[in-house]
């Protein structure tokens, strides 16, 4: 294995590209074109580096690999301490993959401030990879919260008519959670004098149990907002509806996963006793989210809003899997996060192609699109069927394992949560029928042409992954199997 600081390279490559674009390219069309070349090269190289990490990853080792540790601010315990384990590695790959997809997808759809748009995406890629690889809790916090800035700008500048409201709502919700998280970190450091996760795991017992419960709730709120869980969910539909297409892809595909990842990386291992005590409340909230969000999705008239509420429901399966404290449930939750990242990204890209042609997201304005766009209709069908959990697609594996995990803990809860699959089938099949099938009622649809090459290049890899994950789930599950076992040692 090459002795390269591969994690640092992966984190800082997009950041260096951001600095290069900002420092050397002026605001003109030529600069936009050069920025595209730099962003494409950067995202390709970053993706290659994450694939290298995945190939060289030793699945028989349940500890962190490719570890790097450098002192940053020793007086406050801040170190650049990064590495990957079986849980983190796929989120790192997913981040680089979706960023590349988004940059390709935005080449022909973003018309203003192209250079700045690409800068925001590269910056977000760097910050997300940093968050997924951090082993220092303060470093994780800095990456976790800094992601707010580029996403806020993407929604606020390139979003729809109500973009300012949606961006501000997103900012305030996330900032609200970050305050609790920061206060919890300060208290932990005052007692343990370290932000290193491995040190905190060893010394967390020095903190009184009552204080641990308060810390648990403080950190839980931050991750629940990001997931998002009910009642912290209302920012998501507005953000999705107003965000540009590729902004929605990053939001659903990566940012929502930071909440679930935070539960696995921080909340459960640091506070196992409090997690077990409060798990039942999280499970109840998750089941409510699944049923409530599914019913609300059924009533939506906006395509993106429907998919946004479906995301809340799907992330409900993630949280019930995590807080089942079973190996199969947590494995299902991780798989569900990866699967949802791919499915939701493909759905938002598909909606984006429709919006580029008709400039509306209103379901009633469509109908009969499959007559003019058979390739898109096929992609949409596969993504839709996976979203409702059809066997042999990726959506089935994650939901089934999560439900199986909670079934071992609470049978009634499992059956109620399973109703969400039925409701999901109802609203997704209804959406497909009203948009794709039937006669063409809108004369503008008669002039539609099927997917352009760049659209196929953006969507097709996601569709292939949906099928691959569904047919070969063990190739994914086996990678994080030992890490999940290691996580459950304290339970």
UniProtKB/Swiss-Prot annotation:
The record's similarity note reads: Belongs to the complex I subunit 4 family.
Catalytic activity field: a quinone + NADH + 5 H(+)(in) = a quinol + NAD(+) + 4 H(+)(out)
Q: How does it sit in the membrane?
A: Multi-pass membrane protein
> Could you tell me what this protein does?
NDH-1 shuttles electrons from NADH, via FMN and iron-sulfur (Fe-S) centers, to quinones in the respiratory chain. Couples the redox reaction to proton translocation (for every two electrons transferred, four hydrogen ions are translocated across the cytoplasmic membrane), and thus conserves the redox energy in a proton gradient.
Q: Which NCBIfam families match?
A: NDH_I_M, PRK05846.1-3, PRK05846.2-6
Q: Chief localization class?
A: membrane
One GO cellular component this record assigns the protein to is:
plasma membrane
**Protein encoded by which gene:** nuoM
Indicate the transmembrane segments per the record: 5-25, 35-55, 87-107, 116-136, 137-157, 170-190, 203-223, 249-269, 278-298, 315-335, 336-356, 373-393, 409-429, 456-476
* Alphabetical list of InterPro entries matching this protein: NADH_Q_OxRdtase_chainM/4 (IPR010227), NADH_UbQ_OxRdtase (IPR003918), ND/Mrp_TM (IPR001750)
Q: Which cysteines are joined by disulfide bonds?
A: none
From which organism does this entry originate? Rickettsia prowazekii (strain Madrid E)
Keyword vocabulary terms for this entry: Cell membrane, Membrane, NAD, Quinone, Translocase, Transmembrane, Transmembrane helix
GO terms for MF? NADH dehydrogenase (ubiquinone) activity; ubiquinone binding
Q: Which Pfam families match?
A: Proton_antipo_M
Record GO biological process: ATP synthesis coupled electron transport; electron transport coupled proton transport
Protein location: Cell membrane
In Swiss-Prot or TrEMBL terms, this protein is called NADH-quinone oxidoreductase subunit M
EC number(s) recorded for this UniProt protein = 7.1.1.-
Q: Does the keyword Transmembrane helix apply?
A: yes
């Amino acid at each position: 294995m090459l002795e390269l600081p591969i994690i640092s390279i992966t984190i800082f490559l997009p950041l260096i590209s951001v600095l290069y674009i900002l420092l050397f390219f002026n605001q003109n069309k030529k600069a936009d074109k050069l920025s595209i070349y730099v962003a494409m090269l950067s995202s390709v190289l970053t993706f290659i580096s994450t694939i290298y990490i995945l190939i060289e990853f030793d699945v028989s080792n349940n500890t962190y690999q490719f570890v790097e540790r450098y002192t940053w601010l020793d007086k406050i315990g801040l170190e650049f301490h990064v590495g990957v384990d079986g849980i983190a590695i796929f989120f790192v790959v997913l981040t680089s993959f979706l960023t590349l997809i988004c940059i390709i997808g935005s080449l022909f759809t973003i018309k203003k401030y192209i250079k700045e748009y690409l800068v925001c995406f590269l910056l977000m890629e760097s910050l997300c990879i940093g968050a997924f690889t951090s082993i220092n809790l303060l470093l994780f916090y800095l990456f976790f919260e800094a992601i707010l800035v580029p996403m806020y700008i993407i929604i606020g500048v390139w979003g729809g008519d109500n973009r300012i409201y949606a961006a501000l709502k997103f900012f305030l919700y996330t900032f609200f959670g970050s305050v609790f998280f920061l206060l919890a970190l300060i208290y932990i450091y005052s007692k343990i004098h370290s932000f290193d996760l491995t040190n905190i795991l060893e010394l967390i017992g020095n903190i009184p149990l009552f204080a641990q419960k308060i810390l648990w709730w403080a950190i839980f709120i931050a991750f629940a907002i990001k997931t998002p869980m009910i009642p912290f969910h209302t920012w998501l539909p507005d953000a999705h509806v107003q965000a540009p297409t590729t902004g929605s892809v990053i939001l659903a595909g990566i940012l929502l996963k930071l909440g679930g990842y935070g539960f696995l990386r921080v909340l459960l291992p640091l506070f196992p006793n409090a997690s077990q005590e409060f798990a039942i409340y999280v499970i109840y909230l998750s089941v409510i989210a699944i049923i409530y969000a599914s019913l609300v999705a059924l009533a939506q008239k906006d395509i993106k809003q429907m998919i946004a509420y479906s995301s809340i429901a799907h992330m409900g399966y993630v949280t019930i899997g995590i807080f089942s404290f079973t190996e199969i449930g947590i494995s299902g939750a991780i798989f569900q996060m990866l699967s949802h990242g791919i499915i939701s990204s493909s759905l938002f890209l598909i909606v984006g192609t429709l919006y580029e042609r008709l400039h509306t997201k209103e379901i009633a304005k469509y109908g009969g699109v499959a007559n003019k766009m058979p390739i898109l209709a096929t992609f949409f069908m596969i993504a839709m069927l996976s979203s409702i959990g059809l066997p042999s697609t990726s959506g089935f594996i994650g939901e089934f394992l999560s439900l199986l995990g909670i079934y071992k803990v609470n049978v009634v809860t499992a059956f109620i949560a399973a109703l969400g699959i039925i409701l999901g089938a109802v609203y997704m099949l209804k959406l497909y029928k009203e948009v794709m099938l039937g006669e063409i009622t809108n004369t503008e649809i008669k002039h539609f042409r099927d997917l352009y090459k760049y659209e196929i290049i953006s969507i097709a890899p996601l569709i292939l992954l949906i099928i691959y994950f569904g047919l070969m789930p063990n190739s994914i599950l086996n990678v994080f199997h030992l890490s999940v076992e290691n996580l459950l040692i304290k339970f």
